[in-house]
C-alpha cells in the first residue's frame, strides 16, 4: 500500500526522498554542528506526504489541485500520483484527439490522459521511483525531478520505450535490475538525470584528467538550445501568496555553509600583456593551474563543513573523487564567474587555434559547448546568490547514490536538510519568483551530465573548447 496519509508534523516525520517539500515545522535543537542526530521516520522513498498545514500551501504541478506531498520526484496531488503510477506500471499508451496541448486543471485533468501523462513526464516525475511490482519503496532515491529528453518522452508516449524494455528484459532476464519503467542506459555516458556512479570517479592525484569535466559557462542569444531543462508551469505556483519568514535555524545553517566557503578571488595569475599570442600549450597549462587551485579550495571547503565530523574520511574521499568536477563547474558559474568569464576569457581570446585543431574538434566537444552555453545563460538569468550557491553545492556534494559509501542513509538526511533549507531561503528571499527553487535544482543534474560528457573530450581540445565557450558567453552578455 502506498503511504497516502501525511506523517505527524514536527520532530521526525518530515523526511523522505526530498524534493520541493517543506522541512518539519519545527526542527529539534541542533547538536554541536547544527544537526540533529535523531533517526527520521522511514518513509516510502517513492512518495512522501507532508503535514496538512504545510500541504495546504502547495499546489500540484500537474493539475493545480491541492498537493499532498512529494510523489515520484515532484509536488503533486493524490490523483496525479496514482495516475502516473498506473500509467507506468501498466505501460499504458494514450491518444490525444486534439493538439497534444490540452489544459490540465483539477476539473479537466481526466479529459485527456495523453496530455496528463505528457505533463507528468515534462515536469520531471521520476519513473525510477516506481517499483516494477507496484509496491511501495522506490527503486531509486535520487532527490527531485528527473530530466528526460524530448525524444525519450516521445518513445514513452508512443509505447516504443515499453517495447524496447520488454525486449531488453527478454534478452537479459533477471541480470538487469533496472525497473521496466526505467531501463538503465546502455551508453557509457550518464543520462542528463542520472546520478554519478563510481565508474566516473576521478583519482584526486590524477586531476589532470580535469580535462573532461568542468567550467561550464556560455550564452549567445541565437542559441535557443535548451538541454531538457524543464520550465515550470506559470499557473502551478509553488509558493503561498502570503509573506514568509526564514526560520532562525535555517539562517544559522546557511551562515555555517557560507563560512566554509572561500569567496576570495582566485589567485592564479590570468593577466597577459597586449599583443601576446597565447599558445595551445600555455593555455592548457593555465587551465590545469586553475583546476589545481579550484580543487584545493574544494578540499579546504570539506574540512570546514558544519557536518564534517558526522561522516567518515572514507565517505568524504568517495564523495570528493566523484563530485569534484561538478563542484568546480558550479563554482565557476557562480562565485568565480567574473574572473572566469572576464580575465580567463581575455586570455583565451589571445589564443588562435590551428586549422587542424578546428577540423579535428569532436562531436562530444560540440555538445559540451552547447550545453555549457545554455547553462551559463541560465545561471546568468537566475543571478544565483552566495547563499543559494552554498546550498546547491552541499546538495550536489551529498550524493547518497554514489557507490562505496558507508553512510548512505545519513547522507540522504543531510542532503534533504539542505534541500529544504535552500527551498525555504528562496521562498523567503524571492517571493515573486515561485519557480526559482525548481529552476535552481534542475541545474544540478545538468551540471552532472556536462561533467560526465567532458570525460570524452580529448585533452588537446580543451583550449579550443574554453575559447569558444568563454567568447560566446562574454560576447552575449556584453550585448545585454
Swiss-Prot record:
Stretch list, region Sufficient for interaction with UIMC1: 172-253
Gene Ontology BP terms: gamete generation; negative regulation of transcription by RNA polymerase II; positive regulation of mesenchymal stem cell differentiation; regulation of transcription by RNA polymerase II
PANTHER family: KNIRPS-RELATED PROTEIN-RELATED
Major localization listed first in the record, in broad terms: nucleus
Region of interest: Disordered: 1-32, 131-150, 162-199
Gene that encodes the chain: NR6A1
Cell location: Nucleus
Residues where Zn(2+) 1 binds: 60, 63, 77, 80
Upper classification of the organism: Eukaryota, Metazoa, Chordata, Craniata, Vertebrata
Gene3D superfamilies: Erythroid Transcription Factor GATA-1, subunit A, Retinoid X Receptor
Zinc finger residue ranges, NR C4-type: 60-80, 96-120
Classification via InterPro entries: NHR-like_dom_sf, Nucl_hrmn_rcpt_lig-bd, Nuclear_hormone_rcpt_NR3, Nuclear_hrmn_rcpt, Znf_hrmn_rcpt, Znf_NHR/GATA
Protein name: Nuclear receptor subfamily 6 group A member 1
Statement: the UniProt record of this protein carries the keyword Disulfide bond: no
Subunit architecture: Homodimer. Interacts with UIMC1.
